[in-house]
């Protein structure tokens, strides 16, 4: 029990301050529970460690219900190697823990100016952990849990968190931040993972992101499934954000200069989600892309075997769509290039259009529709262009004799049920109420 404020300092040899014995002084505190009614300062050692005694867990500080406002603190001051451990057991931090360099906390050249290591089977952080340099938390066979409103902060260095599973409710902040879980990782809506100057990397087998992740560049990777909840926000201040998973579901917001979404299986953007590549490229790469949310970029790329959905993908300058299987926009999917080119490749064949709107079509249907439409001489250029636009979205062979039906869906006529039917030698325009006007077409283009 620490009942008074205590400072444990390395001894000093007054006659020879360079003594190897003194300069390499180490301190080990072994205990099951370190109760603090006052602060504890450990100063000047080469190595200082607080470790679990015997075959026990280690608890530092006492549980508090006052939001830890009056919690006591353990300080490692000018200690080269600061460590808290419980080999094969659990560490619970109820007190504040920090490392400092009281002579010059900004002097990173000082040997006694390194960070803090916390190692155990399970690590539970119920209060703030602060280092003027680096923090390394390791629970490779267990769980790392951080409490809401707590902060793990490396002021001038990096934070590394490694665990089998992770449940993050507080803030993790450093110049760079790496959070790795070999199994599952959950970041709660209250959580914040912040890389102030560099990369924020979050890696797991399965990941559920409910909070905020930010950095100059951000990478979120799941070897299996990745889910971002509606409460989540993933932002990159001026760089790249990449999400990679076997299967992904995006319900929150993503905002970066460039955004890349990679899935080898299914990628779903949930209605209400918002993905922005503010000044660069939005790239969506998936086997099956189900796009129900809103996505935008200066340039957009959608590469998938199959694509469907009811959402909107908007490019300011250019859009590229490469679908090797089926493109299904019948539920309302819009892929739009506002001011530039929209290049569509369906099953390896390229068609240039301005936008893709609701409908279903195969590449063969599109090419045949455009070929036949060129024969219709009594249509104006505007009408022909309108039909050509419909070609990638609502043109279908409906009979085996190469009859093509275009469901114009308010694009060509004021009646939603209107149709244009083109078969060999004839094009018919129907208002949907039974009336139809037909014109003959020949291969030579003459009526």
Identify the residue ranges that each predicted region occupies.
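Extracellular beta-strand scaffolds
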Residues: 1-3, 8, 12-14, 33-42, ...
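Right-handed parallel beta-helix
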Residues: 6-7, 13, 18-30, 74-75, ...
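Intrinsic low-complexity/disordered segments
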Residues: 21, 185, 226, 443-444
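Charge-rich, low-hydrophobicity low-complexity segments
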Residues: 43, 50, 61, 84, ...
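Extracellular/surface-exposed low-complexity segments
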Residues: 336-447
């Amino acid at each position: 029990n620490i009942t008074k404020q205590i400072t444990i300092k390395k001894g000093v040899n007054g006659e020879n301050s360079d003594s190897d014995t003194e300069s390499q002084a180490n301190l080990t505190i072994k205990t099951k529970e370190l109760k603090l009614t006052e602060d504890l300062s450990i100063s000047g050692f080469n190595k200082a460690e607080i470790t679990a005694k015997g075959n026990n867990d280690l608890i530092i500080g006492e549980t508090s219900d006052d939001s830890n406002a009056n919690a006591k603190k353990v300080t490692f001051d000018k200690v080269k190697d600061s460590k808290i451990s419980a080999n094969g057991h659990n560490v619970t931090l109820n007190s504040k823990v920090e490392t400092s360099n009281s002579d010059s906390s900004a002097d990173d050249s000082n040997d006694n100016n390194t960070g803090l290591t916390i190692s155990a089977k399970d690590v539970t952080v119920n209060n703030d952990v602060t280092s003027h340099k680096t923090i390394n938390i390791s629970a490779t066979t267990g769980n790392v849990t951080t409490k809401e409103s707590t902060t793990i902060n490396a002021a001038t260095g990096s934070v590394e968190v490694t665990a089998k599973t992770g449940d993050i409710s507080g803030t993790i902040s450093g110049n760079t931040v790496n959070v790795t879980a070999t199994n599952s990782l959950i970041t709660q809506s209250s959580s914040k993972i912040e890389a102030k100057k560099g990369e924020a990397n979050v890696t797991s087998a399965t990941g559920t992101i409910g909070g905020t992740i930010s950095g100059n560049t951000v990478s979120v990777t799941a070897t299996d499934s990745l889910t971002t909840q509606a409460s989540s926000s993933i932002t990159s201040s001026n760089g790249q954000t990449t999400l990679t998973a076997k299967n992904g579901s995006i319900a929150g917001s993503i905002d970066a200069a460039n955004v890349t979404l990679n899935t080898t299986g299914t990628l779903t953007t949930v209605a209400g989600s918002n993905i922005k590549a503010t000044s660069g490229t939005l790239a969506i790469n998936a086997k099956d892309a189900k796009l129900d949310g809103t996505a935008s970029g200066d340039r957009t790329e959608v590469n998938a075997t199959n694509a469907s959905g009811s959402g909107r993908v908007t490019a300011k300058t250019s859009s590229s769509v490469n679908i090797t299987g089926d493109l299904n926009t019948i539920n309302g999917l819009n892929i739009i290039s506002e001011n530039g080119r929209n290049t569509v490749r369906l099953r390896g064949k390229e068609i240039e259009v301005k936008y893709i709107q609701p409908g279903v079509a195969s590449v063969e249907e599109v090419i045949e529709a455009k070929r036949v439409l060129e024969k219709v001489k009594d249509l104006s250029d505007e009408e022909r262009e309108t039909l050509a636009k419909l070609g990638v979205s609502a043109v279908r062979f409906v009979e085996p004799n190469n009859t093509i039906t275009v469901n114009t869906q308010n694009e060509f006529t004021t009646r939603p049920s209107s149709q244009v039917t083109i078969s060999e030698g004839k094009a018919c325009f129907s208002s949907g109420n039974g009336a139809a006007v037909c014109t003959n077409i020949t291969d030579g283009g003459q009526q």
